[in-house]
Amino acid sequence: MAPRCWRWWPWSSWTRTRLPPSRSIQNFGQHFSTQEQTPQICVVGSGPAGFYTAQHLLKHHSRAHVDIYEKQLVPFGLVRFGVAPDHPEVKNVINTFTQTARSDRCAFYGNVEVGRDVTVQELQDAYHAVVLSYGAEDHQALDIPGEELPGVFSARAFVGWYNGLPENRELAPDLSCDTAVILGQGNVALDVARILLTPPDHLEKTDITEAALGALRQSRVKTVWIVGRRGPLQVAFTIKELREMIQLPGTRPMLDPADFLGLQDRIKEAARPRKRLMELLLRTATEKPGVEEAARRASASRAWGLRFFRSPQQVLPSPDGRRAAGIRLAVTRLEGIGEATRAVPTGDVEDLPCGLVLSSIGYKSRPIDPSVPFDPKLGVVPNMEGRVVDVPGLYCSGWVKRGPTGVITTTMTDSFLTGQILLQDLKAGHLPSGPRPGSAFIKALLDSRGVWPVSFSDWEKLDAEEVSRGQASGKPREKLLDPQEMLRLLGH
Protein backbone atom coordinates (compact mmCIF):
# COMPACT_ATOMS: atom_id res chain seq x y z
CA MET A 1 0.00 0.00 0.00
CA ALA A 2 1.36 3.41 -0.91
CA PRO A 3 2.28 5.83 1.87
CA ARG A 4 -0.41 8.35 2.56
CA CYS A 5 -1.14 11.37 4.66
CA TRP A 6 -4.73 12.53 4.17
CA ARG A 7 -7.09 9.66 4.87
CA TRP A 8 -9.90 9.22 2.41
CA TRP A 9 -11.13 5.69 2.80
CA PRO A 10 -13.54 4.76 5.60
CA TRP A 11 -12.33 3.04 8.72
CA SER A 12 -14.91 0.30 8.13
CA SER A 13 -13.05 -0.74 4.97
CA TRP A 14 -10.02 -1.81 6.98
CA THR A 15 -9.60 -5.20 8.56
CA ARG A 16 -9.40 -4.19 12.20
CA THR A 17 -6.53 -5.75 14.08
CA ARG A 18 -7.09 -5.67 17.82
CA LEU A 19 -4.50 -6.53 20.41
CA PRO A 20 -5.89 -9.40 22.48
CA PRO A 21 -6.15 -8.60 26.16
CA SER A 22 -5.00 -10.93 28.96
CA ARG A 23 -2.42 -13.64 28.13
CA SER A 24 -1.74 -12.66 24.50
CA ILE A 25 -0.80 -9.12 25.39
CA GLN A 26 1.50 -10.45 28.12
CA ASN A 27 3.25 -12.73 25.64
CA PHE A 28 3.54 -9.88 23.15
CA GLY A 29 5.14 -7.67 25.80
CA GLN A 30 7.63 -10.39 26.70
CA HIS A 31 8.47 -10.91 23.06
CA PHE A 32 9.21 -7.25 22.38
CA SER A 33 10.89 -6.33 25.66
CA THR A 34 13.99 -7.75 27.25
CA GLN A 35 14.63 -4.60 29.26
CA GLU A 36 13.40 -3.66 32.72
CA GLN A 37 9.65 -3.20 32.76
CA THR A 38 8.66 0.47 32.66
CA PRO A 39 5.33 2.28 32.72
CA GLN A 40 4.31 2.73 29.09
CA ILE A 41 2.23 5.90 28.70
CA CYS A 42 0.64 7.28 25.56
CA VAL A 43 -0.24 10.94 24.98
CA VAL A 44 -2.58 11.86 22.11
CA GLY A 45 -1.76 15.33 20.80
CA SER A 46 1.51 17.25 20.61
CA GLY A 47 0.38 20.75 21.47
CA PRO A 48 1.10 22.43 24.80
CA ALA A 49 -1.20 20.09 26.75
CA GLY A 50 0.44 16.99 25.33
CA PHE A 51 4.01 18.16 25.79
CA TYR A 52 3.46 19.56 29.28
CA THR A 53 1.81 16.31 30.35
CA ALA A 54 4.73 14.32 28.93
CA GLN A 55 7.23 16.66 30.57
CA HIS A 56 5.66 16.17 34.00
CA LEU A 57 5.53 12.39 33.65
CA LEU A 58 9.16 12.11 32.57
CA LYS A 59 10.38 14.48 35.28
CA HIS A 60 8.56 12.80 38.14
CA HIS A 61 8.96 9.14 37.20
CA SER A 62 12.49 8.05 36.42
CA ARG A 63 11.51 5.00 34.35
CA ALA A 64 8.32 6.11 32.62
CA HIS A 65 8.32 6.02 28.82
CA VAL A 66 5.99 8.40 26.98
CA ASP A 67 4.92 8.12 23.35
CA ILE A 68 3.22 11.15 21.78
CA TYR A 69 0.87 10.59 18.82
CA GLU A 70 -0.08 13.48 16.55
CA LYS A 71 -2.47 13.76 13.59
CA GLN A 72 -0.33 16.37 11.83
CA LEU A 73 3.05 15.45 10.41
CA VAL A 74 4.67 18.11 12.59
CA PRO A 75 4.54 18.76 16.34
CA PHE A 76 3.62 21.67 18.64
CA GLY A 77 -0.08 22.17 17.83
CA LEU A 78 -1.37 25.69 18.41
CA VAL A 79 2.10 26.99 19.28
CA ARG A 80 2.93 26.47 15.61
CA PHE A 81 -0.50 26.92 14.05
CA GLY A 82 -2.27 29.29 16.46
CA VAL A 83 0.21 31.79 17.89
CA ALA A 84 0.35 34.93 15.75
CA PRO A 85 3.47 35.25 13.55
CA ASP A 86 4.31 38.62 15.11
CA HIS A 87 4.47 37.00 18.57
CA PRO A 88 7.67 34.94 18.21
CA GLU A 89 8.46 35.21 21.92
CA VAL A 90 5.42 33.04 22.71
CA LYS A 91 6.80 30.32 20.44
CA ASN A 92 10.00 30.03 22.49
CA VAL A 93 8.25 27.32 24.49
CA ILE A 94 9.01 25.07 21.51
CA ASN A 95 12.59 24.90 22.81
CA THR A 96 11.33 23.29 26.02
CA PHE A 97 9.10 20.89 24.11
CA THR A 98 12.04 19.93 21.88
CA GLN A 99 14.12 18.95 24.90
CA THR A 100 11.25 16.75 26.09
CA ALA A 101 10.92 15.09 22.69
CA ARG A 102 14.66 14.39 22.55
CA SER A 103 14.58 12.44 25.79
CA ASP A 104 15.50 8.79 25.34
CA ARG A 105 12.29 8.01 27.25
CA CYS A 106 10.04 9.93 24.86
CA ALA A 107 9.05 9.28 21.25
CA PHE A 108 6.99 11.31 18.78
CA TYR A 109 4.78 9.73 16.12
CA GLY A 110 3.33 12.26 13.72
CA ASN A 111 0.96 11.53 10.83
CA VAL A 112 -1.07 9.21 13.06
CA GLU A 113 -4.74 10.05 13.50
CA VAL A 114 -6.09 8.42 16.63
CA GLY A 115 -9.67 7.34 16.09
CA ARG A 116 -8.93 6.68 12.43
CA ASP A 117 -5.54 5.02 12.00
CA VAL A 118 -5.65 3.43 15.44
CA THR A 119 -8.43 3.29 18.01
CA VAL A 120 -8.26 4.53 21.57
CA GLN A 121 -9.03 1.00 22.75
CA GLU A 122 -6.03 -0.32 20.84
CA LEU A 123 -3.87 2.31 22.54
CA GLN A 124 -5.27 1.30 25.92
CA ASP A 125 -4.46 -2.33 25.17
CA ALA A 126 -0.87 -1.40 24.33
CA TYR A 127 -0.14 1.09 27.14
CA HIS A 128 -0.57 1.26 30.89
CA ALA A 129 -2.26 4.66 30.55
CA VAL A 130 -3.50 6.92 27.75
CA VAL A 131 -3.82 10.71 28.02
CA LEU A 132 -6.06 12.58 25.56
CA SER A 133 -4.54 16.02 24.89
CA TYR A 134 -5.77 16.65 21.37
CA GLY A 135 -7.17 20.13 21.95
CA ALA A 136 -10.06 21.86 20.21
CA GLU A 137 -9.92 21.33 16.46
CA ASP A 138 -13.26 22.85 15.53
CA HIS A 139 -14.96 26.24 15.83
CA GLN A 140 -18.28 27.35 17.25
CA ALA A 141 -20.73 27.93 14.41
CA LEU A 142 -22.74 31.15 14.22
CA ASP A 143 -25.91 29.26 13.28
CA ILE A 144 -27.38 32.25 11.42
CA PRO A 145 -28.66 32.64 7.85
CA GLY A 146 -25.96 33.46 5.33
CA GLU A 147 -23.15 31.84 7.29
CA GLU A 148 -22.38 29.65 4.28
CA LEU A 149 -21.81 32.60 1.91
CA PRO A 150 -18.37 33.16 0.35
CA GLY A 151 -16.57 35.79 2.38
CA VAL A 152 -17.54 34.23 5.72
CA PHE A 153 -14.82 32.31 7.56
CA SER A 154 -14.09 31.09 11.03
CA ALA A 155 -11.24 32.94 12.70
CA ARG A 156 -9.75 29.53 13.37
CA ALA A 157 -9.50 28.79 9.65
CA PHE A 158 -8.15 32.28 8.93
CA VAL A 159 -5.47 31.86 11.60
CA GLY A 160 -4.65 28.43 10.19
CA TRP A 161 -4.31 29.98 6.73
CA TYR A 162 -1.73 32.59 7.67
CA ASN A 163 0.06 30.19 10.05
CA GLY A 164 0.45 27.35 7.56
CA LEU A 165 -1.99 24.74 8.83
CA PRO A 166 -2.13 22.27 5.92
CA GLU A 167 -5.91 21.91 5.94
CA ASN A 168 -6.31 25.69 5.53
CA ARG A 169 -3.55 26.33 3.00
CA GLU A 170 -6.02 26.84 0.14
CA LEU A 171 -8.46 29.06 2.04
CA ALA A 172 -7.76 32.06 -0.25
CA PRO A 173 -9.86 34.71 1.54
CA ASP A 174 -10.94 37.60 -0.69
CA LEU A 175 -9.42 40.74 0.84
CA SER A 176 -10.60 43.10 -1.90
CA CYS A 177 -13.29 44.69 0.30
CA ASP A 178 -12.97 47.88 2.32
CA THR A 179 -14.47 46.64 5.60
CA ALA A 180 -14.12 43.45 7.63
CA VAL A 181 -16.21 42.45 10.64
CA ILE A 182 -14.91 40.13 13.33
CA LEU A 183 -17.54 38.58 15.59
CA GLY A 184 -16.14 38.04 19.08
CA GLN A 185 -13.94 40.08 21.37
CA GLY A 186 -11.24 37.71 22.58
CA ASN A 187 -7.51 37.57 21.93
CA VAL A 188 -7.98 35.58 18.72
CA ALA A 189 -10.25 38.33 17.38
CA LEU A 190 -7.58 40.93 18.11
CA ASP A 191 -4.88 38.74 16.56
CA VAL A 192 -6.90 38.50 13.34
CA ALA A 193 -7.64 42.23 13.32
CA ARG A 194 -3.98 43.03 13.89
CA ILE A 195 -2.80 40.78 11.07
CA LEU A 196 -5.38 42.31 8.70
CA LEU A 197 -4.25 45.86 9.51
CA THR A 198 -0.51 45.51 10.13
CA PRO A 199 1.62 46.98 7.33
CA PRO A 200 2.82 43.90 5.40
CA ASP A 201 6.43 45.09 5.59
CA HIS A 202 6.20 44.56 9.35
CA LEU A 203 5.28 40.91 8.81
CA GLU A 204 7.82 39.95 6.16
CA LYS A 205 10.45 38.91 8.73
CA THR A 206 8.03 36.64 10.62
CA ASP A 207 7.09 33.03 9.90
CA ILE A 208 3.80 33.98 8.23
CA THR A 209 3.31 31.96 5.07
CA GLU A 210 4.41 33.55 1.82
CA ALA A 211 0.94 33.01 0.34
CA ALA A 212 -0.71 34.89 3.20
CA LEU A 213 1.86 37.68 3.07
CA GLY A 214 1.25 38.08 -0.66
CA ALA A 215 -2.51 38.28 -0.12
CA LEU A 216 -2.09 40.85 2.66
CA ARG A 217 0.11 42.98 0.39
CA GLN A 218 -2.80 43.14 -2.06
CA SER A 219 -5.45 43.65 0.64
CA ARG A 220 -7.82 46.60 0.36
CA VAL A 221 -9.21 46.19 3.87
CA LYS A 222 -9.07 49.59 5.58
CA THR A 223 -11.55 49.20 8.44
CA VAL A 224 -12.06 46.35 10.89
CA TRP A 225 -14.97 46.23 13.34
CA ILE A 226 -14.65 43.88 16.33
CA VAL A 227 -18.17 43.09 17.52
CA GLY A 228 -19.35 41.74 20.87
CA ARG A 229 -22.76 40.77 22.28
CA ARG A 230 -22.03 42.34 25.65
CA GLY A 231 -20.26 45.45 26.93
CA PRO A 232 -16.73 46.67 27.70
CA LEU A 233 -16.66 44.97 31.11
CA GLN A 234 -17.17 41.58 29.47
CA VAL A 235 -14.46 41.67 26.79
CA ALA A 236 -12.29 38.54 26.76
CA PHE A 237 -9.07 39.99 25.34
CA THR A 238 -6.15 40.98 27.55
CA ILE A 239 -4.26 44.23 27.96
CA LYS A 240 -1.21 43.19 25.94
CA GLU A 241 -3.27 42.52 22.83
CA LEU A 242 -5.29 45.71 23.29
CA ARG A 243 -2.15 47.80 23.68
CA GLU A 244 -0.77 46.32 20.46
CA MET A 245 -3.93 47.36 18.62
CA ILE A 246 -3.83 50.90 20.01
CA GLN A 247 -0.18 51.30 19.00
CA LEU A 248 -0.48 49.57 15.62
CA PRO A 249 1.37 51.64 12.98
CA GLY A 250 -0.80 53.33 10.38
CA THR A 251 -4.06 52.72 12.23
CA ARG A 252 -6.36 54.60 14.56
CA PRO A 253 -8.91 53.32 17.09
CA MET A 254 -12.63 54.10 16.83
CA LEU A 255 -14.31 53.85 20.24
CA ASP A 256 -17.61 55.47 21.16
CA PRO A 257 -17.29 57.31 24.52
CA ALA A 258 -20.98 56.62 25.16
CA ASP A 259 -20.18 52.92 25.53
CA PHE A 260 -18.02 53.71 28.56
CA LEU A 261 -20.34 55.98 30.56
CA GLY A 262 -20.29 55.09 34.25
CA LEU A 263 -17.53 52.54 33.76
CA GLN A 264 -15.01 54.39 35.95
CA ASP A 265 -17.05 53.80 39.10
CA ARG A 266 -17.83 50.18 38.25
CA ILE A 267 -14.20 49.09 37.92
CA LYS A 268 -12.98 50.38 41.28
CA GLU A 269 -13.39 46.98 42.93
CA ALA A 270 -12.28 44.94 39.91
CA ALA A 271 -9.25 42.65 40.06
CA ARG A 272 -6.06 44.44 39.06
CA PRO A 273 -5.65 42.92 35.54
CA ARG A 274 -9.27 43.70 34.63
CA LYS A 275 -9.02 47.17 36.16
CA ARG A 276 -5.88 48.01 34.14
CA LEU A 277 -7.54 46.77 30.96
CA MET A 278 -10.65 48.88 31.56
CA GLU A 279 -8.57 51.95 32.40
CA LEU A 280 -6.70 51.63 29.10
CA LEU A 281 -9.99 51.30 27.21
CA LEU A 282 -11.39 54.32 29.03
CA ARG A 283 -8.37 56.50 28.30
CA THR A 284 -8.38 55.53 24.64
CA ALA A 285 -12.10 56.18 24.26
CA THR A 286 -12.54 59.34 26.28
CA GLU A 287 -9.28 61.24 26.69
CA LYS A 288 -7.95 63.68 24.13
CA PRO A 289 -4.70 62.30 22.70
CA GLY A 290 -1.45 64.22 22.95
CA VAL A 291 -0.09 66.19 20.01
CA GLU A 292 2.11 63.37 18.72
CA GLU A 293 -0.56 60.70 19.09
CA ALA A 294 -3.20 62.97 17.53
CA ALA A 295 -0.95 63.52 14.52
CA ARG A 296 -0.33 59.79 14.20
CA ARG A 297 -4.03 59.03 14.23
CA ALA A 298 -4.81 61.82 11.77
CA SER A 299 -2.37 60.38 9.26
CA ALA A 300 -3.56 56.78 9.67
CA SER A 301 -4.93 55.14 6.54
CA ARG A 302 -6.59 52.27 8.39
CA ALA A 303 -8.89 52.03 11.39
CA TRP A 304 -10.34 49.53 13.82
CA GLY A 305 -13.19 49.79 16.27
CA LEU A 306 -15.03 47.93 19.01
CA ARG A 307 -18.80 47.58 18.66
CA PHE A 308 -20.55 46.57 21.86
CA PHE A 309 -24.07 45.30 22.58
CA ARG A 310 -24.49 43.76 19.12
CA SER A 311 -25.41 40.17 18.30
CA PRO A 312 -25.20 38.70 14.75
CA GLN A 313 -28.56 37.82 13.20
CA GLN A 314 -27.84 37.31 9.51
CA VAL A 315 -25.03 37.61 6.99
CA LEU A 316 -26.43 39.79 4.21
CA PRO A 317 -25.76 38.69 0.62
CA SER A 318 -24.61 40.84 -2.27
CA PRO A 319 -27.31 41.74 -4.86
CA ASP A 320 -26.37 38.73 -6.98
CA GLY A 321 -26.36 36.49 -3.90
CA ARG A 322 -22.85 35.26 -4.57
CA ARG A 323 -21.02 36.57 -1.52
CA ALA A 324 -21.29 38.36 1.82
CA ALA A 325 -21.99 42.09 1.61
CA GLY A 326 -22.89 42.94 5.20
CA ILE A 327 -24.13 41.68 8.51
CA ARG A 328 -27.36 42.35 10.39
CA LEU A 329 -26.82 42.93 14.09
CA ALA A 330 -29.40 42.85 16.85
CA VAL A 331 -28.92 45.60 19.42
CA THR A 332 -28.69 44.06 22.90
CA ARG A 333 -28.83 45.07 26.53
CA LEU A 334 -27.48 43.29 29.59
CA GLU A 335 -29.48 41.38 32.17
CA GLY A 336 -28.17 39.73 35.31
CA ILE A 337 -25.24 40.37 37.60
CA GLY A 338 -21.62 39.23 37.52
CA GLU A 339 -20.98 35.89 35.81
CA ALA A 340 -24.72 35.55 35.11
CA THR A 341 -24.76 38.67 32.92
CA ARG A 342 -26.24 37.88 29.52
CA ALA A 343 -27.14 39.86 26.42
CA VAL A 344 -30.79 40.02 25.41
CA PRO A 345 -32.12 41.67 22.23
CA THR A 346 -33.88 45.01 22.52
CA GLY A 347 -35.80 44.55 19.28
CA ASP A 348 -33.68 47.03 17.33
CA VAL A 349 -31.39 45.94 14.51
CA GLU A 350 -28.73 47.59 12.39
CA ASP A 351 -27.00 46.58 9.18
CA LEU A 352 -23.24 46.91 8.88
CA PRO A 353 -21.82 46.77 5.33
CA CYS A 354 -18.74 44.57 4.94
CA GLY A 355 -17.21 42.14 2.49
CA LEU A 356 -15.44 39.87 4.97
CA VAL A 357 -16.96 38.25 8.07
CA LEU A 358 -14.76 36.35 10.51
CA SER A 359 -16.38 34.40 13.33
CA SER A 360 -14.28 34.31 16.49
CA ILE A 361 -16.77 33.09 19.07
CA GLY A 362 -14.73 30.15 20.31
CA TYR A 363 -13.12 26.84 19.52
CA LYS A 364 -14.59 23.46 20.41
CA SER A 365 -13.31 19.92 20.73
CA ARG A 366 -14.57 16.97 18.74
CA PRO A 367 -15.23 13.43 19.95
CA ILE A 368 -12.20 11.35 19.02
CA ASP A 369 -13.52 7.80 19.19
CA PRO A 370 -16.89 6.10 19.88
CA SER A 371 -15.35 4.34 22.88
CA VAL A 372 -14.53 7.64 24.62
CA PRO A 373 -17.32 9.52 26.45
CA PHE A 374 -17.89 13.04 25.19
CA ASP A 375 -20.10 15.90 26.36
CA PRO A 376 -21.29 17.66 23.17
CA LYS A 377 -22.83 20.53 25.10
CA LEU A 378 -19.65 21.46 26.97
CA GLY A 379 -17.37 20.18 24.22
CA VAL A 380 -15.15 18.22 26.61
CA VAL A 381 -14.36 14.67 27.62
CA PRO A 382 -16.18 14.15 30.97
CA ASN A 383 -13.54 13.82 33.66
CA MET A 384 -12.73 14.17 37.32
CA GLU A 385 -9.39 15.95 37.79
CA GLY A 386 -8.27 14.54 34.45
CA ARG A 387 -9.52 10.98 34.98
CA VAL A 388 -11.98 10.18 32.18
CA VAL A 389 -15.29 9.18 33.73
CA ASP A 390 -15.98 5.43 33.70
CA VAL A 391 -12.85 4.55 31.68
CA PRO A 392 -10.02 3.40 33.98
CA GLY A 393 -6.55 4.16 32.65
CA LEU A 394 -7.79 6.94 30.36
CA TYR A 395 -6.96 10.58 31.19
CA CYS A 396 -7.24 13.99 29.56
CA SER A 397 -5.51 17.36 29.75
CA GLY A 398 -5.77 20.79 28.18
CA TRP A 399 -8.73 22.11 26.23
CA VAL A 400 -10.38 18.73 25.76
CA LYS A 401 -10.38 18.46 29.56
CA ARG A 402 -11.59 21.91 30.61
CA GLY A 403 -12.76 23.68 27.43
CA PRO A 404 -10.94 26.12 25.12
CA THR A 405 -10.05 28.82 27.62
CA GLY A 406 -6.90 30.32 29.07
CA VAL A 407 -3.37 30.86 27.80
CA ILE A 408 -0.40 28.52 27.48
CA THR A 409 0.52 28.84 31.16
CA THR A 410 -3.05 27.84 32.08
CA THR A 411 -2.63 24.70 30.00
CA MET A 412 0.74 24.02 31.62
CA THR A 413 -0.75 24.05 35.12
CA ASP A 414 -3.71 21.94 34.01
CA SER A 415 -1.49 19.37 32.27
CA PHE A 416 0.89 19.08 35.21
CA LEU A 417 -2.14 18.29 37.38
CA THR A 418 -3.26 15.50 35.05
CA GLY A 419 0.27 14.10 35.06
CA GLN A 420 0.32 14.19 38.84
CA ILE A 421 -3.04 12.39 39.08
CA LEU A 422 -1.85 9.69 36.67
CA LEU A 423 1.33 9.09 38.67
CA GLN A 424 -0.69 8.91 41.88
CA ASP A 425 -2.89 6.23 40.31
CA LEU A 426 0.19 4.37 39.11
CA LYS A 427 1.74 4.43 42.59
CA ALA A 428 -1.53 3.33 44.20
CA GLY A 429 -1.77 0.30 41.90
CA HIS A 430 -4.85 1.51 40.05
CA LEU A 431 -3.25 0.93 36.63
CA PRO A 432 -2.30 -2.40 35.00
CA SER A 433 0.88 -3.83 36.49
CA GLY A 434 1.86 -6.32 33.81
CA PRO A 435 4.11 -5.48 30.86
CA ARG A 436 2.65 -3.58 27.93
CA PRO A 437 4.19 -3.50 24.44
CA GLY A 438 3.63 0.20 23.84
CA SER A 439 4.72 1.56 20.48
CA ALA A 440 6.08 -1.75 19.22
CA PHE A 441 2.61 -3.15 18.71
CA ILE A 442 1.10 0.14 17.56
CA LYS A 443 3.80 0.59 14.92
CA ALA A 444 3.08 -2.90 13.65
CA LEU A 445 -0.61 -2.05 13.40
CA LEU A 446 0.12 1.20 11.58
CA ASP A 447 2.45 -0.55 9.16
CA SER A 448 -0.24 -3.11 8.34
CA ARG A 449 -2.61 -0.21 7.60
CA GLY A 450 -0.24 1.70 5.36
CA VAL A 451 0.39 4.54 7.80
CA TRP A 452 3.86 6.09 7.91
CA PRO A 453 4.59 7.58 11.34
CA VAL A 454 6.84 10.64 11.32
CA SER A 455 9.49 10.60 14.05
CA PHE A 456 10.91 13.60 15.87
CA SER A 457 14.17 13.22 13.96
CA ASP A 458 12.06 13.33 10.77
CA TRP A 459 10.52 16.57 12.04
CA GLU A 460 13.98 17.99 12.66
CA LYS A 461 14.79 17.36 8.99
CA LEU A 462 11.63 19.22 7.97
CA ASP A 463 12.48 21.95 10.46
CA ALA A 464 15.93 22.38 8.89
CA GLU A 465 14.33 22.57 5.44
CA GLU A 466 11.89 25.27 6.57
CA VAL A 467 14.67 27.30 8.16
CA SER A 468 16.77 26.98 5.01
CA ARG A 469 13.91 28.15 2.80
CA GLY A 470 13.25 31.10 5.09
CA GLN A 471 16.85 32.32 5.03
CA ALA A 472 16.55 33.36 1.40
CA SER A 473 14.01 36.04 2.32
CA GLY A 474 15.25 36.85 5.80
CA LYS A 475 12.48 34.92 7.56
CA PRO A 476 12.97 32.58 10.53
CA ARG A 477 11.40 29.84 8.41
CA GLU A 478 9.15 29.24 5.42
CA LYS A 479 6.65 26.65 6.58
CA LEU A 480 6.00 23.57 4.51
CA LEU A 481 2.29 23.46 3.71
CA ASP A 482 1.78 20.29 1.65
CA PRO A 483 1.83 17.00 3.61
CA GLN A 484 2.70 15.06 0.47
CA GLU A 485 5.73 17.27 -0.10
CA MET A 486 6.79 16.69 3.50
CA LEU A 487 6.58 12.93 3.03
CA ARG A 488 8.58 13.14 -0.20
CA LEU A 489 11.29 15.14 1.55
CA LEU A 490 11.47 12.37 4.14
CA GLY A 491 11.73 9.68 1.47
CA HIS A 492 8.30 8.17 2.10
Swiss-Prot record:
Its main location: mitochondrion. Its EC number is 1.18.1.6. The keyword Hydrolase does not apply. FAD binds at A49, E70, L78, V114, W399, G406, V407, I408. It comes from the Eukaryota. Keywords: Cholesterol metabolism, Electron transport, FAD, Flavoprotein, Lipid metabolism, Membrane, Mitochondrion, Mitochondrion inner membrane, NADP, Oxidoreductase, Phosphoprotein, Steroid metabolism, Sterol metabolism, Transit peptide, Transport. It is a peripheral membrane protein. It holds the Pfam family Pyr_redox_2. It is found in: Mitochondrion inner membrane. One of its GO terms (biological process) is ubiquinone biosynthetic process. One of its GO terms (molecular function) is ferredoxin-NADP+ reductase activity. Its cofactor is FAD. GO terms for cellular component: mitochondrial inner membrane; mitochondrion. Belongs to the ferredoxin--NADP reductase type 1 family. This is NADPH:adrenodoxin oxidoreductase, mitochondrial. It comes from Bos taurus (Bovine). The gene is FDXR.
